[in-house]
Design a protein with these regions (language model features):
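Active-site acidic catalytic loop and adjacent metal/ATP-binding pocket
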Residues: 37-40, 47, 173-222
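Short strand-connecting beta-turns/loops that link adjacent beta-strands
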Residues: 83-85, 202-204, 260
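An alpha-helical support segment within catalytic cores of ATP-dependent transferases
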Residues: 6-22, 94, 112-116, 124-190, ...
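ATP-binding pocket architecture of kinase catalytic cores
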Residues: 25-142
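A general structural signal marking secondary-structure boundaries and capping sites
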Residues: 19, 68-71, 96, 125-133, ...
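Short, surface-exposed alpha-helical segments at coil->helix boundaries
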Residues: 8-12, 61, 236-239
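Helix-rich C-terminal or lid/interface subdomains of diverse kinases
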Residues: 113-117, 217-296
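Glycine-rich, phosphate-binding/catalytic loops in enzymes
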Residues: 64, 106-107, 204, 225-227
Length: 296
C-alpha cells in the first residue's frame, strides 16, 4: 500500500511540474503492467508512465495520428506529454475491460458482434498502416527467440506432466517454423486482448481500443494469439471474421501454437514461484488449450 502511495505521489509531482495549471483532484493507480504504470486522474484522464526506456511514446503518437479520424473505434488522443520524464495523458475512453464472466454472460449474437468489432478494428488498422510504412516508421519485429530459450531452459525437463510437455514441444516446433517465415508480414497492433479494450456492457459492443505500445512488424498469425489464452472461441471467431472482410489467409493452428508457446514461456518465467497465481494461471491456461477438441 505504501509503495502504491509513493508511486502515486511521484507521478502527481511529475505532472504538476510539467503542467502546474492542471488541477489534480483525484489520482488512482489502475495498473502496474508489464511495461507501464497506468494512472487515472480526476476520473477523466488516463496517464501512462513507461517502466522501461525502450517504450517509444513518440512512435505511438505518430501511429495514433495516422489513425485519428479514420478508424471506427475510439482511440487515445494524447493531450499531455512528459517534458522531463516520459509519460502521456489522454481522456479516458468510456467502457470496461472484458472479463471472462462478462463474456460468458453474452448472447451468441452479442459474441458475434464483439468478434466483428475486433476483426474490423484490425482490418482498419492494417489497411491504414500497410507494411510499406514500416521503414518510414522505423518499425522492427519483437524478439521472439526469448520464449523458446526460456522454455528450453526452465520448462522442458522440469515439467512433470509428460502429456502436457509433449503438447508444448509440438507447438514449440510450429512456433520456431513461424518465426522464420518472412511471408505474410504486416504492421501488427500486436496487443489485442481483453484488458486493452473499452467494452460497452449495455450495447455489448466495443467503444474503443488503447495501448499502442507493442506495434511491430510481425507475421499475421502473431496478431491474434493473445486472444486464445483468454477465450479460444472468441479468438477463432475474430479470425473467421477478419478472414472474411480482409480476404487474407490465416492458419488458426499457427495462431494457436503461438498462444501455447507464449503461455508456456510464462511457466518458465515464474518457474521458481510454482505456488504463485501467475504460474498457476499459466498452467491452467495450457491445460485448457490442450483439452480443446478442435480448432476453427
Amino acid at each position: 500500500m505504501k509503495t502504491n502511495e509513493s508511486q502515486i505521489n511521484k507521478f502527481k509531482k511529475i505532472i504538476k511540474q510539467d503542467y502546474p495549471d492542471f488541477k489534480i483532484e483525484s489520482i488512482k493507480l489502475l495498473k502496474a503492467g508489464w511495461c507501464n504504470f497506468v494512472v487515472e486522474i480526476n476520473k477523466t484522464y488516463i496517464f501512462r508512465f513507461p517502466k522501461k526506456d525502450d517504450v517509444d511514446l513518440d512512435l505511438e503518437a505518430k501511429i495514433l495520428k495516422i489513425l485519428k479520424g479514420r478508424i471506427t473505434l475510439e482511440i487515445p488522443v494524447y493531450e499531455f506529454f512528459g517534458k522531463k520524464s516520459s509519460y502521456v495523458g489522454y481522456k479516458k475512453i468510456t467502457g470496461q475491460p472484458l472479463t471472462a464472466t462478462l463474456l460468458k454472460s453474452l448472447s451468441l449474437k452479442s459474441k458475434q458482434l464483439l468478434a466483428s468489432d475486433m476483426a474490423n478494428f484490425l482490418y482498419e488498422f492494417h489497411k491504414l498502416l500497410p507494411i510499406t510504412k514500416a521503414k518510414q516508421l522505423n518499425l522492427g519485429s519483437d524478439n521472439h527467440k526469448w520464449r523458446p530459450e526460456v522454455i528450453q531452459k526452465y520448462v522442458i525437463g522440469k515439467l512433470r506432466n509428460k502429456k502436457l510437455l509433449d503438447f508444448i514441444e509440438i507447438n514449440l516446433d510450429k512456433y520456431l517454423e513461424l518465426i522464420k517465415d518472412k511471408s505474410n508480414l504486416i504492421i501488427a497492433y500486436n496487443d489485442l486482448h481483453q484488458n486493452n479494450i473499452a467494452f460497452n456492457k449495455k450495447s455489448s459492443r466495443l467503444n474503443g481500443i488503447f495501448d499502442f505500445g507493442d506495434v511491430a512488424v510481425e507475421h499475421i498469425s502473431i496478431e491474434f494469439y493473445r486472444l486464445f489464452s483468454f477465450d479460444p472461441e472468441l479468438a477463432t471467431n475474430v479470425i473467421k471474421q477478419y478472414k472474411k472482410i480482409s480476404g487474407r489467409k490465416i492458419s488458426v493452428e499457427r495462431v494457436f501454437g503461438t498462444a501455447v508457446v507464449s503461455i508456456a514461456a510464462m511457466l518458465g518465467v515464474y518457474n521458481r514461484q510454482p505456488n504463485s497465481k501467475k504460474y498457476k494461471d499459466a498452467l491452467n491456461d495450457l491445460l485448457r488449450l490442450k483439452s480443446l477438441k478442435r480448432l476453427g
